[in-house]
Amino acid sequence: MKKTPLLNVALSRVIAGMGHGDILVIGDAGLPVPPGVELIDLAITPGLPDFASVLRVVLSELQVERHVLAEEMQKVVPPALVEIERLKGKLGKREWLTHEDFKVLSRSARAVVRTGECQPYSNIALISGVTF
């Protein structure tokens, strides 16, 4: 059995296969998943799992060079943004896009991880870095 916090097989596989510059999106329950992009659906009920818990576990395994957020998140300030601020040392450089442009970016993702989060704009695109 794995010794690290991430136990989900599909998510472990995607992270293990990511290279420098690859994108992994963690999204709320309402974020659309573009056709052709793998969906890793963790949502079981509204609020479970929450965005922050999934982000913390993903960051235990993924080296992140930069991250992208929707500009609209700044106006709503969901709990997700509070957690992102807390973890900013593990997230690299920050970029902002409109929510519509964020959805366009998600077309390039290796996968979209759907959480049970129901706070608006609780989405992040993680761009993989290198450990050397």
Swiss-Prot record:
Pathway per the UniProt entry: Carbohydrate metabolism; D-ribose degradation; D-ribose 5-phosphate from beta-D-ribopyranose: step 1/2
Catalytic activity line of the entry: beta-D-ribopyranose = beta-D-ribofuranose
Amino acids binding substrate: 28, 99, 121-123
Subcellular location: Cytoplasm
Active site: 20 (proton donor)
Gene Ontology CC entries for this record: cytosol
Catalytic activity, EC: 5.4.99.62
InterPro entries listed in its UniProt record: D-ribose_pyranase (IPR023064), RbsD-like_sf (IPR023750), RbsD_FucU (IPR007721)
Gene Ontology biological process terms, A to Z: D-ribose catabolic process
Function: Catalyzes the interconversion of beta-pyran and beta-furan forms of D-ribose.
UniProt KW Nucleotidyltransferase keyword: no
UniProt family annotation: Belongs to the RbsD / FucU family. RbsD subfamily.
Claim: Methyltransferase is one of the keywords in the record: no
Organism: Pseudomonas putida (strain ATCC 47054 / DSM 6125 / CFBP 8728 / NCIMB 11950 / KT2440)
Keyword annotations from UniProtKB, A to Z: Carbohydrate metabolism, Cytoplasm, Isomerase
GO molecular function: D-ribose pyranase activity; intramolecular lyase activity; monosaccharide binding
Subunit-level organization: Homodecamer.
Name of this chain's protein: D-ribose pyranase
Main subcellular localisation: cytoplasm
Domain of life: Bacteria
